[in-house]
Amino acid sequence: MKILLLGIGNVLYADEGIGVHFVNYIHENYQFSHPEHQLVMLDGGTLAQGLTPIIAQYQALIVVDTVNAAGCEPGEVYFFDFDNAPPEIDWQGSAHEVEMLQTLTMMEMMGDRPHTMVLGVTPTVIEPMTLGLTERISAAVPVMEKALINYLTKLGWQCEKIGNTDIAELIPQSYIPRLSMGDRDSGNAPQGKEPQETE
């Protein structure tokens, strides 16, 4: 089985970039292995519908993004099956959040959507243009990390922590795609680092 860990968001709008920052953070600090499955990490930016042919190649998908949840404080972490979203999740946050919902719904109608999990956090600031994360979202990163690692471990993955790079250290370079579609396919990543594909 091929699993795609997909970070979604606009890094130029503060907390809206958490999906991209988080996937870069996991890629930087962990090594994953499984006797049967493959894990690929991808910085999806704000492409949404443009990712459809990529997503369709996988049997499982984990989307990391901000989520809008009625009545919830900023920094609340959610990890749920897309088919059974909590009732307070209304998908009415940023434009790319709405478009990602439309993309997954369209893929479901076409029969191309893989089993989808969503790892999300409610944002504090998504405008004006700011590069960085607010304190509440930064504090949510360890909770998101634990949720993801626990999930993968239950699926039989060996999750080895190989670094201790803070997410804030990765943000200044986040406008440069570290895990792009082309890099994933060709194996040629910027700064001499290959996107993580584990079989």
Predicted regions and their residues:
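Helix-loop-strand module that forms the ligand-binding subsite of alpha/beta enzymes
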Residues: 67-116
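Phosphate-binding/catalytic loops
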Residues: 100-192
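A short, flexible beta-alpha/helix-coil linker loop
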Residues: 10-11, 85-87, 124-127
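Conserved active-site and cofactor/substrate-binding residues in soluble primary-metabolism enzymes
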Residues: 17, 21, 46, 95-101, ...
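Residue-level signal for pocket-adjacent positions within structured domains
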Residues: 7, 72-75, 93, 128, ...
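Nucleotide and nucleotide-moiety/phosphate-recognizing core
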Residues: 3-6, 11-84, 159
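Short alpha-helix boundary/capping segments
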Residues: 10, 14, 91, 95, ...
